[in-house]
């Protein structure tokens, strides 16, 4: 993988990630294909929304169908028939979200398989081996996702263990002679001093890109913005920056303003299945009765298959009847909305008009523009 930085506007960056399997224009949003599928969508449909890279879930694919089934097909690309780049998370977040079902030690994490109750062990080394078999174009290190709230002492211990695990991940990745990219994950909770230690430690080890982890876990938005403003300038400018698990359209805009290049989130797909649709003017809850006889398109600014062909009334009808097609059409639209938003952000950075676009974006959804810290507006 090669990262090319093409243009900046304030802290925002316009670039591209070049892989053997294709080019990803950044800032980029990655749809989530947890079990080797973006729910309800064929790979061709996902590609038509404008997506250039997907996220797969190491934890879930390891438990089912397992490494052996994956290897029978070649790798995850062949298994799911997506031939563009794939980033896989390390399984860390899923393991730590199991709560009482898991036990953390220096060696790794022992937990109860949520599918069949078996006792399972996942370590940095094992995560690297699974992701190697998946053929991931971007491999994520195995880390502990520090929960929120966490006091300074807990966040420090967690971050320090994540650093040790980062080194073990790097070592096993290199032993496997994996020629793909490996990203480090910056931890440290909402504490700037701990984030500083994490960034320095990861940069000293050396990675192909750097993710900001442990955000979007319940902390106030102001804390997320503060940490991003503090951390992003410390990440080497020639490496991509990835904000994990984020998020709402506003979060993508704010991440880009602060220097983030890559995002992923289940929100567009999960919300689509619940009839919660993102449009230029905010959100449409398609189940609401006011859409029953609305012949208008969902979003007049959108060029997706759904908006080109169907009315709000039809989407409302499908939702009320719990028809599978409704969930599919909603998903097509939400994914296209996210990709159009990213394309607009890229264009605005290219033209040096990012803040003008930000004002337009918030004006359409009827919200004030969140302030940048003074050093970002100098």
UniProtKB/Swiss-Prot annotation:
Q: Which GO terms describe its molecular function?
A: metal ion binding; tRNA-guanosine(34) queuine transglycosylase activity
Task: Tell me the superkingdom of the source.
Answer: Bacteria
Where does the record place a coiled coil? none
As its record notes, the protein acts as a catalyst of: 7-aminomethyl-7-carbaguanine + guanosine(34) in tRNA = 7-aminomethyl-7-carbaguanosine(34) in tRNA + guanine
The answer to whether keyword tRNA processing applies is yes
Residues reported in the UniProt entry to bind Zn(2+): 302, 304, 307, 333
Q: Where are the transmembrane segments?
A: none
- InterPro entries under this entry? ArchSynthase1/Queuine_TRR (IPR050076), TGT (IPR004803), TGT-like_sf (IPR036511), tRNA_ribo_trans-like (IPR002616)
Q: Which Gene3D superfamilies match?
A: Queuine tRNA-ribosyltransferase-like
Region RNA binding, as annotated, extends over 245-251, 269-273
Q: Which GO terms describe its biological process?
A: queuosine biosynthetic process; tRNA wobble guanine modification; tRNA-guanine transglycosylation
Details of cofactor binding: Binds 1 zinc ion per subunit.
The protein's enzyme class: transferase
- Binding of substrate occurs at 89-93, 143, 187, 214
Q: What are the required cofactors?
A: Zn(2+)
What pathway does the UniProt record associate with this protein? tRNA modification; tRNA-queuosine biosynthesis
Q: Which UniProt keywords apply?
A: Glycosyltransferase, Metal-binding, Queuosine biosynthesis, Transferase, tRNA processing, Zinc
Summarize the protein's role: Catalyzes the base-exchange of a guanine (G) residue with the queuine precursor 7-aminomethyl-7-deazaguanine (PreQ1) at position 34 (anticodon wobble position) in tRNAs with GU(N) anticodons (tRNA-Asp, -Asn, -His and -Tyr). Catalysis occurs through a double-displacement mechanism. The nucleophile active site attacks the C1' of nucleotide 34 to detach the guanine base from the RNA, forming a covalent enzyme-RNA intermediate. The proton acceptor active site deprotonates the incoming PreQ1, allowing a nucleophilic attack on the C1' of the ribose to form the product.
Spell out the HAMAP family in the cross-references.
Q_tRNA_Tgt
Oligomer status and interactors: Homodimer. Within each dimer, one monomer is responsible for RNA recognition and catalysis, while the other monomer binds to the replacement base PreQ1.
Which protein are we looking at?
Queuine tRNA-ribosyltransferase
Species for this entry: Yersinia enterocolitica serotype O:8 / biotype 1B (strain NCTC 13174 / 8081)
């Amino acid at each position: 993988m090669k990262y090319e930085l093409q243009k900046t506007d304030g802290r925002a960056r316009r670039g591209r990630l070049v892989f053997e399997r294709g080019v990803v224009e950044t800032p980029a949003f990655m749809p989530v294909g947890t079990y080797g599928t973006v729910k309800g969508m064929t790979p061709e449909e996902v590609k038509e929304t404008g997506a250039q890279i997907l996220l797969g879930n190491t934890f879930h694919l390891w438990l089912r169908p397992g490494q052996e089934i994956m290897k029978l097909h070649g790798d995850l690309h062949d298994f799911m028939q997506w031939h563009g780049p794939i980033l896989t998370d390390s399984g860390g977040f899923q393991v730590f979200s199991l709560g009482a079902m898991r036990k953390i030690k220096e060696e790794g994490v022992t937990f109860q398989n949520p599918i069949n109750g078996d006792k399972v062990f996942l370590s940095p080394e094992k995560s690297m081996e699974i992701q190697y078999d998946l053929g991931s174009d971007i491999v994520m290190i195995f880390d502990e996702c520090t929960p929120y709230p966490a006091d300074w002492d807990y966040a420090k211990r967690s971050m320090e263990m994540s650093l040790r695990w980062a080194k073990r991940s790097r070592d096993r990745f290199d032993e496997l002679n994996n020629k793909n990219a490996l990203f480090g994950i910056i931890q440290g909770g909402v504490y700037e001093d701990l984030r500083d230690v994490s960034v320095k430690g990861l940069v000293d080890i050396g990675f192909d890109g750097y993710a900001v982890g442990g955000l979007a876990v319940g902390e106030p938005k102001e804390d997320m913005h503060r940490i991003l403003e503090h951390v992003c300038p410390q990440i080497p400018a020639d490496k991509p920056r990835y904000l994990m698990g984020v998020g709402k359209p506003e979060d993508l805009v704010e991440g880009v303003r602060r220097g983030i290049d890559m995002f992923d989130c289940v929100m567009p797909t999960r919300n689509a299945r619940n009839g919660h649709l993102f449009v230029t003017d905010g959100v449409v809850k398609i189940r609401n009765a006011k859409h029953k006889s609305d012949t208008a398109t969902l979003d007049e600014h959108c060029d997706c298959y759904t908006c080109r062909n169907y009315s709000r009334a039809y989407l409302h009808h499908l939702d009320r009847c719990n028809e599978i097609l409704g969930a599919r059409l909603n998903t097509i639209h939400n994914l296209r909305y996210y990709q159009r938003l990213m394309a607009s952000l890229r264009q605005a950075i290219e033209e040096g008009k990012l803040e003008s676009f930000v004002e337009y974006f918030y004006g359409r959804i009827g919200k004030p523009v969140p302030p940048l810290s003074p050093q970002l507006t100098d």
